[in-house]
C-alpha cells in the first residue's frame, strides 16, 4: 500500500513483526511525548512499556507499520476479541504528523481486521487529545463510552463498523 497524497513522502505499509519491536518502541516513545505534555506526566503505558513487553504484544498482532525508505514512521497495533478489532498505540513520528500517516495506518489496520473477520473496530484516547479525536471522528469513529477519572471522562472509547 502506498500513500496517495502528493505532498507527503511515499509510505509503504506492511504487517507489524516482532522484529520491529525496537524501532516501534522508539517511535512510540517519541510520538507519545506530546501526550505526556498534555496530561502533565510521563507515567503512561506507551512511555513505560518495555521492549520485552512490546515483543510479547507483537506475537500474532494484526497491527501495521508504515515505512519511508528504511525508517518506520507510523505504527499501530490491533488484536481480535471475537468480531471486535481492538486498535491501540497508533503512533506517527513527530516530524511526520499531519501528513496523512495516521489515516493511512488506521485504514491498513482496519483492513487487516476485516480480513481476519472483524465486524467492528474500537479504540480509545484521552479526553484532552484533540488531534486524536479529530482524526478518529474524521475516519468514521463515534464515541461509545467514557471511563476513568473522577468524572468518568479521562478516556474516550470510540467505535466504527467495518462492514457495509
Positions of PLM-derived features:
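Conserved beta-strand in the GNAT
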Residues: 65, 71-79, 86-91
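Conserved beta-strand-loop-alpha-helix junction that forms the acyl-donor binding cleft
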Residues: 123-133, 149-154
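Conserved GNAT-fold acetyl-CoA-binding loop/helix
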Residues: 26-54
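A short helix-loop-beta-strand connector motif used in the catalytic cores of GNAT acetyltransferases and
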Residues: 53-65, 86
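A short, internal acetyl-CoA/4′-phosphopantetheine-binding micro-motif in the GNAT/acyltransferase core
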Residues: 65, 90-97, 125-127
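Conserved acetyl-CoA-binding loop-helix of GNAT-fold acetyltransferases
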Residues: 92, 98-111, 134-138
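A short beta-loop-alpha structural element at the N-terminal edge
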Residues: 11-26
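Conserved GNAT acetyl-CoA-binding A-motif
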Residues: 113-125
Amino acid at each position: 500500500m502506498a500513500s496517495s497524497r502528493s505532498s507527503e513522502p511515499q509510505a509503504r505499509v506492511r504487517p507489524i513483526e516482532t522484529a520491529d519491536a525496537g524501532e516501534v518502541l522508539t517511535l512510540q516513545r517519541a510520538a507519545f511525548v506530546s501526550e505526556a505534555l498534555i496530561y502533565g506526566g510521563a507515567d503512561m503505558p506507551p512511555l513505560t512499556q518495555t521492549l520485552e513487553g512490546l515483543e510479547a504484544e507483537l506475537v500474532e498482532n494484526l497491527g501495521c507499520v508504515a515505512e519511508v525508505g528504511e525508517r518506520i514512521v507510523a505504527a499501530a497495533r490491533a488484536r481480535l476479541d471475537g468480531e471486535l478489532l481492538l486498535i491501540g498505540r497508533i503512533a506517527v513520528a513527530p516530524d511526520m504528523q499531519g501528513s496523512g500517516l495516521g489515516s493511512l495506518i488506521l485504514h491498513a489496520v482496519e483492513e487487516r481486521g476485516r480480513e481476519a473477520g472483524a465486524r467492528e473496530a474500537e479504540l480509545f484516547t484521552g479526553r484532552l487529545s484533540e488531534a486524536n479525536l479529530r482524526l478518529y471522528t474524521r475516519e468514521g469513529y463515534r464515541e461509545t463510552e467514557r471511563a476513568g477519572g473522577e468524572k468518568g471522562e479521562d478516556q474516550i472509547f470510540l467505535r466504527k463498523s467495518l462492514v457495509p
